[in-house]
Amino acid sequence: APNSMGAVVASIGATQVLTTANAAKSVRDGMDFFPLTVDVEERAYAAGKIPGSFFRREGRPTEDAILTCRLTDRPLRPSFPDGFRHETQVVTTVIGADQENPHDVLSINAASAALMISGIPFDGPLGTVRMAYSQEGEWIPHPTYEESENGTFEIVIAGRELEDGDVAVMMVEAGGSENAFYYYDDGAKKVTEEVLGDALQACKVWIKESIALQRQLVASVIATHGPIEPMSWTPVLDYTSEIFDAVEKI
């Protein structure tokens, strides 16, 4: 972490993650896409356990870790400038797991924060929140595992704050809980379009809160270590202006 361009430790409850962000100084020859790698490494010691294998090694990534990588990649990737082709790696290591608070949304917010202090060109900060819909018909922000399981529906929303103070939603991931149908049979409140619309509005408060915390972090880093030096990079054009003009005329 000390050698990374940006490193952040974030926590919710006793769940804690370390996220680092790094980018190559030069572009590899022939690179015609943005090589962004997002990795989430879950460690057994985070939950106070030691792997039981002979060599005490960690196993392959879990399904949850892979899904968290994809969930993190979605709002991050379009937030880099056009033409940026430097290989970039965002790595999150789960260093504490309290078995109550999930680390996936925390990882996205930590990734945004790490990029904000790294000097890597990034149009952030981004804020992300998970909201669970309870059987009583209330949206619960940043729910615990138990609150999500006892709810009928949950939604993960990522966004950025606009100049006018509104929030532009960049990603929505939603789905019903495993026992939702049983809860509905017992009379639980159902999720309608109006209810989802309320969630998209309510989430903006929590997204802004995450963004505000990241801006406070940036200000603290600048106050302690001086201005964040932006990395030097040159946009890679996929085509010349002449080719673009010719295609427009077709």
Language model features: what each stretch is:
Residues 1-2, 149:
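A short catalytic or substrate-binding loop motif that flags glycine-/basic-rich loops and adjacent residues
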Residues 4-89, 94-101, 168, 173-188, ...:
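Glycine-rich, flexible beta-strand/loop modules in the N-terminal catalytic cores of phosphate-handling
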Residues 14, 108, 115:
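DPxDG-like acidic metal-binding loop motif
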Residues 51, 55-57, 67, 71-72, ...:
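Small-residue-enriched alpha-helical segments and adjacent helix-cap loops
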Residues 101-102, 203:
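Short, aromatic/basic-enriched loop-to-helix "N-cap" motif that marks the start
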Residues 119-250:
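Mobile "lid/hinge" segments at catalytic clefts and subdomain interfaces of large enzymes
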